[in-house]
Amino acid sequence: MSTNEEKKNVLFGSENQPWQQIISDLGIDSELQVSPPEQDSCCTYDQIPGISCRDFQLSPKGLTPEQRQTALQQLHEYQSQQQKYFLGYQTNQKLDYEDDLKRYLNFFLNNLGDPFQSGNFTVNSKFMERAVLDYYAALWNARWPHDPKDPESYWGYVLTMGSSEGNLYGVWNARDYLSGKFLLDDPDAEEDAKQASRDDQPRSVPRRLIYQKTRPPQDNPNAFTPVAFYSEDTHYSIIKAMQVMEIKTFYELGTELYPDENPLAPGEQWSKEVPSENGSAGSGSIDIEKLVKLVEFFAAKGYPILVCFNYGTAFKGAYDDVERAGKALMPILEKYGLFERKVHYDPAHPGKYDIRNGFWFHVDGALGAAYMPFIEMAYNAGQIKHRRPNFDFRLPFVHSLVMSGHKWIGAPWPCGIYMTKTKFQLRPPDEPEYIGSPDTTFAGSRNGFSAMIFWDYLAKNSYKAQIEKALYTENFATHAYQKLLELQEKLQLDLWVEHTPLSLTIRFKQPNPDIVFKYSLSCETLYVYQEKRQYCHIFMMAQVNNQLIDELIADLSQRNAFPEQDTRISQPSNEIFVAKEAKKLLQIPHTGRGFK
């Protein structure tokens, strides 16, 4: 801990002045109004090549135009350099929005609340958002336009975050739907207002909504306890969403309540996640046969089922076969009364109930949902030999779907789309005395600029243009894969080169830190063939060209490109004792599995 005198003398800002001097020059009593730095943050934070930490520190005096320009020039040079060699993540760096949209940077555009309710905050782009949502509803085979009176029509919105927000919202929607919750008007709201008025306190009657949860039947205490399933290649945002929404996974329930009944390996520990095909060495797609066994175990005990599928996993770019999985699970759900069931919302009136599914299938299509429809079009036109399985609303068992806008499409910031059907929103029943309002977007304020970005991109790019772009990126993925295989042969070194069919990513042995930084490579530890391996991957997005791949291959050809790795799997050095009654908690990975 620094002394007060040391704190006051910490150098700060581009002029390298002591903090106390800066504060004193402004006539501020630093003891009462602002706290000094505990230490020099430029020595604490990561140092970025090409960036002067001092030039970016925000002095209480502000920055002069010259200082600001110096910092911004460094910023531009750094970002331009990193963008030029960007290969490691699934984001399109080839953007074209400046000419059309730069004039709107001085507008505060807020798509507040539901996109289908214009509202009184009129500086918004909801009319553009609705056009974007209709576009993707058509592309994903949903019924459109949105019609609140048509339960089969789509509902959705443009996300302010990436697909992480959509995954969280989808899991939230699924939890409330499966746990038998209803959104109702509070019948006491009007009575409260009447009572206040009798006391000469004029009071409006605000619409006050309450959540009500139905009670499970006596013969099935598990009827409204959802259990979640997702593969070991699932993005961590899904796993975090389960924790935030307090949804138990099959691993948690199995370990806690059925420790010796693991259907995949009786008597052995439960898997934390549904295994992927061939484990870490496989493509990354969910193992459907094992999923079916796990789901049937819990369906037989009356639990409603929540399955999160992937369509373009973050690290391997794998696609779950949603159609085959759904068809395999439907007979099980029908067998145990989970295909459709009555959900009563008024114990006093048995005739008041909803008919709901006892399952929810969510598709995380952060990457694949943006471009696979165009691969399908190319396949149908005979332009490509293969396509991936269906994943969208043509499958009657799909409840919700998310896609990121900053990945294959390309955007200056994270954004995305969440879509479901109107009938799956948490809505009040139809009887007048119970009418509330539909549950709507996750965030109140939403970035209106994101809808404009989507609209501008789609207005410039026809289906034909996007088919050409999809084929370009697919062909480049095959090209880069072959180049890495040739390098492996040339070096006579196993580089662990792997490529999931029709994915845009190629993974290989992690090179040295300089190469990782230059190309912004995403790295991850995988346990493969009884070895602990450090992998990295590259994504073939629209900005990638032959010159960039050739330069990467040249760098990887250098003698010190691939440091030796210790692939031995070490045992824990300290034995950890856990009390018998301690519960096993959900495991959330903090590294790897890409990003949203």
What are these regions (language model features)?
Residues 137-138, 172-176, 455-460:
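Short glycine/serine- and small hydrophobic-enriched flexible loop segments
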Residues 109-115, 309, 453-460:
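A short small-residue
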Residues 1-70, 184-219, 256-263, 267, ...:
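Eukaryotic N-terminal low-complexity, Ser/Thr- and Lys/Arg-rich leader segments
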Residues 69-73, 77, 216, 239, ...:
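Conserved C-terminal alpha-helix-loop-beta "cap" of PLP-dependent enzymes
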Residues 153, 158, 162-169, 173-427:
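Conserved PLP-enzyme active-site core in the AAT-like
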Residues 2-154, 165, 533-539, 543, ...:
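N-terminal entrance/gating region of PLP-dependent enzymes' catalytic architecture
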Residues 116-124, 155-162, 226, 230, ...:
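Conserved aromatic-histidine-acidic binding/catalytic patches
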Residues 138-150, 180-186, 484-497:
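Surface-exposed helix-capping loop/turn segments at secondary-structure junctions
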